[in-house]
């Protein structure tokens, strides 16, 4: 626990649009790499604008029934970029978590069970992507942020309202 009562966790977080992606996983699993990839994707327009919240260690607490993430004070504005070392970058002081990505997840499957696609943190249910060892998480995160689930109605054109490319409607993870 931190001084303000929030949980301190070994994770990274990036705010994309109005929501943060919380990236969890063991040491060396690629948390910082995915965080930086998301920052680059935001700059390129592939996803909504992205800003670092925290890398390596973040604080979690609840706010009005939502999960809030903040950077660890001593690491605020710092990100590890393999091959360059620790670098400074712009950061957000806090964000509401809209998506959790678990790297090196044991329950990663090609067609995951619905219960594998959510997680409960501090009593709050959050959408989740389990990513297995050896799989690239960036395409999965971009897909989660820019597509919707397939409907059983057969009206597949309504699933992606604006078609292809960068014009797909955002999902709850970024709203």
What are these regions (language model features)?
Residues 19-21, 75, 124:
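Short acidic/polar mixed-charge low-complexity motifs
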Residues 93-175:
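Conserved NTP phosphate-binding and transfer environment spanning the P-loop NTPase/kinase superfamily
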């Amino acid at each position: 626990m931190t001084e303000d009562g929030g949980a301190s966790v070994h994770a990274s977080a990036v705010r994309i649009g109005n929501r943060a992606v919380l990236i969890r996983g063991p040491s060396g699993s690629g948390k910082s790499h995915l965080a930086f990839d998301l920052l680059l994707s935001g700059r390129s327009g592939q996803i909504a604008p992205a800003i670092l919240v925290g890398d390596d260690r973040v604080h979690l607490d609840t706010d009005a029934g939502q999960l809030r993430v903040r950077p660890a004070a001593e690491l605020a504005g710092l990100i590890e970029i393999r091959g360059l070392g620790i670098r400074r970058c712009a950061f957000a002081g806090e964000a509401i978590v809209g998506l959790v990505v678990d790297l090196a997840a044991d329950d990663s499957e090609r067609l995951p069970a619905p219960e594998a696609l959510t997680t409960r943190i501090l009593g709050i249910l959050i959408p989740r992507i389990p990513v297995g060892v050896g799989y690239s998480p960036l395409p999965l995160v971009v897909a989660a942020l820019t597509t919707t689930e397939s409907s059983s109605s057969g009206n597949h054109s309504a699933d992606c309202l604006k078609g292809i490319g960068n014009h797909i409607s955002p999902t709850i993870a970024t709203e």
